[in-house]
Amino acid sequence: MLYRIARAGIFKLDAEKAHDLAIQNFKRFNGTPLDIFYRQNLASKPVEVMGIKFKNPVGLAAGLDKNGECIEAFGAMGFGFVEVGTVTPRPQSGNDKPRLFRLIEAEGIINRMGFNNLGVDNLVENVKKAKYDGVIGINIGKNKDTPIEKGTEDYLICMEKVYQYAGYIAINISSPNTPGLRTLQYGEALDDLLSQLKEKQKELAEKYGKYVPVALKIAPDLEDDELTQIAESLIKYKIDGVIATNTTLDRSMVEGMKHAEEMGGLSGRPVQTRSTEVVRRLKELLGDNLPIIGVGGIDSYVAAKEKMVAGAELVQVYSGFIYKGPGLVRDIVNNI
């Protein structure tokens, strides 16, 4: 009820201004009596995935806390894990504004943010300071001005810098808002990326004396043969997990709605069915070789359960959280 009242005011603001205001307030309220507005004490529902113990299987998807500024606040809401980023080697401002749009009648969001972030070094400092007893995933990407043929270098730079501080590392090659990025999902480009990531992971595991899992985040807009090839590569290179899915370019579910024709990736309820289909197909292809983290349109316990029945061992929320608030986390954790 409280969030529904607050949302009415928040949704009168420009979407990105509302996001920035929320981040500022979470930073301001954290650790003060005012965090009572979002703090939730949830029952422990521990699971072990990728060799990591999670307090519960519900996580915050990347993109909401790009710079790792509010990790404790999201932890206070009951998330079992928080994925920060996407972060790049160097700071970048992202695409021109406006670049974030609500499709309220569909409970969807279109974004073309373009990996706006303060850089990996800033993120690492925030993660180091965070007092959170859950799992922190760090989502990494490439800078827009890095040629795609040199993109792997950006991932390796970020991986080296975040390795000590990450519970797991997510490799984002599926955002539609960085030109050419999705080409890394295919063929030799994918194999080259995965092989170099595994080599770097082995090197860093020996250096720091701990093994940090690596998960690949993929798009929903993949043909079956493309999905099959990705699954084969994930198994071949012994990648630790896969996150399915990122945002979609498909607009068939939102035709005629305000903002539907805006460029960018569509998330929220409109991508729910397709992302679940990808999870289900991945499970068929992967078997028990590696776990799936399901994300895309999860806006209720029922939607989370659908992802898990399809084959996901963990779930993440973002757009559903924007529309439903912290109560969504409670709903899923209590009923899972």
UniProtKB/Swiss-Prot annotation:
Cellular component GO terms, alphabetical: cytoplasm; plasma membrane
Cofactor needs: FMN
Listed Gene3D superfamilies: Aldolase class I (3.20.20.70)
Primary location class: membrane
Residues that hold substrate according to the record: 66, 111-115, 172, 177, 246-247
Membrane-related topology note: Peripheral membrane protein
Subcellular localization(s) per the UniProt record: Cell membrane
Binding site for FMN: 62-66, 86, 139, 172, 217, 245, 268, 297, 318-319
A Pfam family the protein falls into: DHO_dh
Free-text comment on the cofactor: Binds 1 FMN per subunit.
Keywords per UniProt: Cell membrane, Flavoprotein, FMN, Membrane, Oxidoreductase, Pyrimidine biosynthesis
Reaction catalysed by this enzyme: (S)-dihydroorotate + a quinone = orotate + a quinol
InterPro entries, sorted: Aldolase_TIM, DHO_dehydrogenase, Dihydroorotate_DH_1_2, Dihydroorotate_DH_2, Dihydroorotate_DH_cat, Dihydroorotate_DH_CS
Pathway: Pyrimidine metabolism; UMP biosynthesis via de novo pathway; orotate from (S)-dihydroorotate (quinone route): step 1/1
Gene Ontology MF terms: dihydroorotate dehydrogenase (quinone) activity
GO biological process: 'de novo' pyrimidine nucleobase biosynthetic process; 'de novo' UMP biosynthetic process
Enzyme active site: 175
Keyword Flavoprotein: yes
Record-stated family: Belongs to the dihydroorotate dehydrogenase family. Type 2 subfamily.
Function: Catalyzes the conversion of dihydroorotate to orotate with quinone as electron acceptor.
Quaternary structure (record): Monomer.
HAMAP family referenced in this protein's UniProt entry, alphabetically: DHO_dh_type2
Protein name according to UniProt: Dihydroorotate dehydrogenase (quinone)
